[in-house]
A protein has these predicted regions:
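Short glycine-rich, low-complexity/disordered patches
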Residues: 23-26, 108-125, 171-189
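Generic secondary-structure transition motif, activating predominantly at the C-termini of alpha-helices
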Residues: 12-19, 166, 170, 187
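Generic hydrophobic/packing signal
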Residues: 60, 72, 77-78, 127, ...
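Helical (often loop-to-helix) elements that flank the catalytic cores of nucleotide-handling enzymes
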Residues: 81-110, 137-183
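Eukaryotic intrinsically disordered and solvent-exposed regulatory patches
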Residues: 44-48, 55-60, 122-131, 178-187
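DNA replication initiation on ssDNA origins
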Residues: 1-102, 111, 115-119
Length: 189
């Protein structure tokens, strides 16, 4: 084990958080743990993390979202496995679906918030390919609106307004998830 990984592991062990307790970061791969790093120690964590990454160590920590942050969206699409006849799993949504979704978000955001036109930017990220998971086909996109900074209550409100338009924007063939499961609320807080 490298020195960088040992140093990071010792630091992480010092701030390990029990399930259900306050946390600042979680690891989404082995070991799956949560940590609660004090603000005054956070730069040390980032430096140790950077050293480990540049040393070739694969790490998968996420940060707990802050109450005031850019609008974030996680759309989780699930499809019946039998809806994919061919050997290769193909994507069921297309660019037109993504444009419709992002456009609907912008319409809702701009209707309820006073947003400068230059702030109407969205970044859309997607997995390279859909995957099979628990006998379903799993796919989805993440969207971030980097210049539209709001609190979590506003993000929940926007999510509610999106769910009201779900029939229009999630008209994707063979989708088998309900809108409340598609628009993941866990990304908000």
């Amino acid at each position: 084990m490298s020195v960088a990984k040992n140093d990071l592991q010792a630091f992480i062990n010092k701030y390990k958080s029990e399930k259900g307790k306050a946390f600042t970061n979680t690891s989404i791969a082995n070991p799956r743990i949560s940590v609660n790093i004090p603000t005054e120690c956070y730069d040390t964590f980032l430096n140790l993390y950077a050293l480990a990454i540049t040393g070739g160590i694969s790490l998968y920590f996420t940060e707990k979202p802050l109450d005031i942050s850019p609008i974030r969206v996680d759309l989780d699409f699930r499809f019946s496995k039998d809806s994919h006849e061919d050997k290769y799993i193909t994507r069921k949504y297309n660019d037109a679906h993504v444009h419709k979704i992002v456009d609907t978000y912008f319409k809702i955001i701009n209707y309820y918030l006073d947003i400068d036109e230059k702030s109407n930017i969205a970044y859309v990220m997607e997995k390279p390919n859909p995957t099979e998971f628990r006998n379903k086909i799993k796919d989805g996109i993440h969207i971030i609106f980097p210049h539209i900074i709001v609190n979590n209550n506003i993000q929940y409100f926007i999510r509610t307004k999106i769910l009201e338009k779900a029939q229009e924007i999630f008209d994707i063939t063979d989708i088998c998830a309900i809108p409340d499961d598609i628009v993941d609320k866990a990304i908000i807080s």
